[in-house]
Amino acid sequence: MKPPPRRRAAPARYLGEVTGPATWSAREKRQLVRLLQARQGQPEPDATELARELRGRSEAEIRVFLQQLKGRVAREAIQKVHPGGLQGPRRREAQPPAPIEVWTDLAEKITGPLEEALAVAFSQVLTIAATEPVTLLHSKPPKPTQARGKPLLLSAPGGQEDPAPEIPSSAPAAPSSAPRTPDPAPEKPSESSAGPSTEEDFAVDFEKIYKYLSSVSRSGRSPELSAAESAVVLDLLMSLPEELPLLPCTALVEHMTETYLRLTAPQPIPAGGSLGPAAEGDGAGSKAPEETPPATEKAEHSELKSPWQAAGICPLNPFLVPLELLGRAATPAR
């Protein structure tokens, strides 16, 4: 039987105003300074050790506060060397903001205080991607999975693909993985001079890579990547300039331009919206006391309404970019 219809509601983290972490008291700051002074010989303070001695503060809060201290020290050092800024006070005021700064400021105004909720949602997306069967099959060596389908084979170390294992594609996953076990055998004599540790360095676990990106997006403790996994992450970053021109840039530019003009256009003032509180305050004596509770309920409802709810957009996609504009543009067939 068909289940009864269920009304989908927004997550609880999107409903209310997300409050930031509690401010640091003077006692906590003095205690943190003493802990940092005791670790002057260390190149980088460990937030885990500091959280054990500094009660009431988590690793994430300590890590964020340390980043704020580093940024403050860097700004003070720049101000001492360049009192008027890197290009002087007048030049700095006249310099227009960079495009990324304009979009970042606009996104912050739209999402409001939901930055932490957006970081959590983005981290959850990467966590789900880490458990995808295709992700497990792309790892080297491939991880066992119950997903049915033809696993995608990785290229050999010499850059040549092995066409032989592709023939028994209709066979189940277990027999197809069995012939791959003797493949690393001929590589051992060539790697014996480098030592057994190189085998672990060349292992690529995409599940660990996704977990690493998920933890980094939330400034959390990330797993340690191998040399090959670090090379994969570096290659992803270096390939961004090559991948951006492959997007449908013309349609993407048109959409972003229309979105910017729509979001920055002056909004018309509603007829009764702005005069509602003032009219209620002026005519409080003429109105009956029975009409005041609905007005207070509306005021409370408007106060609980987030900026993204008032704008009618999803905070995970504040600029309403269609998904087809985020993929590679279709190349014309030759």
UniProtKB/Swiss-Prot annotation:
* Pfam families given in the database record: SNAPC2
Sorted alphabetically, the Gene Ontology cellular component annotations on this record are: cytosol; nuclear body; nucleoplasm; nucleus
- Compositional bias (Low complexity): 167-180
Mention one GO biological process in which this protein takes part, according to its record.
snRNA transcription
Spell out the residue ranges making up region: Disordered. 137-200, 271-306
Q: Which UniProt keywords apply?
A: Nucleus, Transcription, Transcription regulation
Q: Signal peptide span per the entry?
A: none
Chief location bin: nucleus
Q: Where is this gene product found?
A: Nucleus
Which is one GO molecular function term here? RNA polymerase II general transcription initiation factor activity
Keyword Transcription regulation in the entry? The reply is yes
Which ranges does the record mark as transmembrane? none
Q: Quaternary structure per UniProt?
A: Part of the SNAPc complex composed of 5 subunits: SNAPC1, SNAPC2, SNAPC3, SNAPC4 and SNAPC5. SNAPC2 interacts with TBP and SNAPC4.
The protein's job, in short, is:
Part of the SNAPc complex required for the transcription of both RNA polymerase II and III small-nuclear RNA genes. Binds to the proximal sequence element (PSE), a non-TATA-box basal promoter element common to these 2 types of genes. Recruits TBP and BRF2 to the U6 snRNA TATA box.
Q: What is this protein called?
A: snRNA-activating protein complex subunit 2
Organism of provenance: Homo sapiens
* Lineage summary: Eukaryota, Metazoa, Chordata, Craniata, Vertebrata
Q: Which gene encodes it?
A: SNAPC2
